[in-house]
């Protein structure tokens, strides 16, 4: 951390290097910056790889206009989600007068400056990295069984002076399940006891990330190239029941980064930065998805008569 006193206030700058943030298996640079800078607050509301990225606050939660800080990658405005931790050399966090002096109005909520790796003179290096991540549901809801649900309905109706919706024999049928006797053996589909959360979702999801880096150079030429591939599969238990369509939450992204440095003369240098990213995502449904449907399934079918 660097704090310098100026006439109009203190200038704050925090610099984080690759060896600090690249110790965790993060999908992108946004997740690697958690807890890495004093005054840098990160908030993430969900774990969806495809559409949810953390929100950054450099001036605290009271940042002006609720705006995120300015993000620059090698001096150009870029989406931080397209940058992988492996390709980053350092990150600088500017706030207050330091950001405003450099970037004007765009820097009123601070600035995050990302510097990517570059090759070194007279060296050769190849690095391969593989991360395998098992994802868990931190707050998975627990559902009661059908019998407890039926008893709760009867109790609630009793408080309102209404008659019970389910007879004692029906509650017993729910409790015994399809392997029980009596009504449940005769009508297994009329008195089901199914935990739809367990039937729909599995306990874990899998993510894999592959990265290969080439760097080096000679006396007047330096290069750095990074190729990355990220794949993620969600928690849907049986996603391929429909022919030709998968209901799984899936996300994949391929990254390419190339930085070239050429010394044309002793005073003239040419730099070339190339960045490419290709991503694909799919999920079950749009306005309605499986996470919502497990809450709306009825405890039993409507009674039918001939």
Regions found by a protein language model. Give the residues of each.
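Face-selective signature of the C-terminal outer-membrane beta-barrel domain
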Residues: 224, 257, 261-284, 288-294, ...
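Short, small/polar-rich motifs associated with maturation and membrane association
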Residues: 5-257, 269-271
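Residue-level detector of conserved catalytic or cofactor/ligand-binding positions
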Residues: 1, 7-15, 299, 303-306
């Amino acid at each position: 951390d660097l704090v310098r006193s100026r006439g109009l206030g203190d200038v704050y700058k925090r610099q984080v290097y690759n060896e600090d943030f690249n110790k965790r298996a993060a999908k992108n640079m946004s997740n690697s910056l958690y807890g890495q800078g004093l005054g840098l607050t990160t908030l993430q509301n969900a774990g969806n790889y495809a559409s949810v990225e953390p929100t950054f606050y450099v001036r605290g939660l009271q940042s002006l206009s609720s705006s995120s800080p300015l993000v620059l990658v090698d001096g150009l405005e870029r989406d931080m989600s397209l940058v992988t931790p492996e390709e980053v050399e350092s990150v600088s966090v500017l706030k207050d007068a330091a950001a405003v002096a450099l970037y004007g109005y765009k820097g009123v909520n601070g600035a995050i400056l990302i510097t990517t790796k570059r090759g070194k003179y007279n060296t050769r290096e190849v690095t391969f990295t593989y991360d395998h991540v098992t994802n868990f549901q931190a707050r998975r809801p627990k559902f009661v069984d059908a019998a407890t649900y039926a008893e709760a309905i009867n109790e609630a109706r009793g408080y309102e002076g209404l008659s019970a919706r389910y007879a004692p024999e029906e509650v017993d049928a729910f409790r015994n399940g399809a392997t029980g006797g009596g009504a449940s053996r005769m009508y297994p589909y009329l008195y089901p006891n199914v935990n739809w959360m367990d039937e729909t979702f599995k306990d874990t999801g899998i993510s894999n990330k592959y990265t290969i880096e080439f760097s080096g150079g000679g006396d007047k030429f330096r290069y750095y190239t990074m190729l990355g591939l990220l794949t993620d599969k969600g928690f849907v238990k049986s996603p391929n029941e429909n022919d030709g369509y998968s209901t799984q939450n899936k996300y994949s992204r391929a990254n390419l980064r190339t930085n070239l440095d050429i010394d044309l003369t002793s005073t003239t240098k040419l730099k070339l930065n190339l960045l490419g990213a290709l991503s694909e995502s799919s999920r079950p449904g749009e306005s309605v998805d499986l996470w919502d449907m497990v809450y709306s399934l009825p405890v039993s079918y409507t009674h039918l008569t001939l």
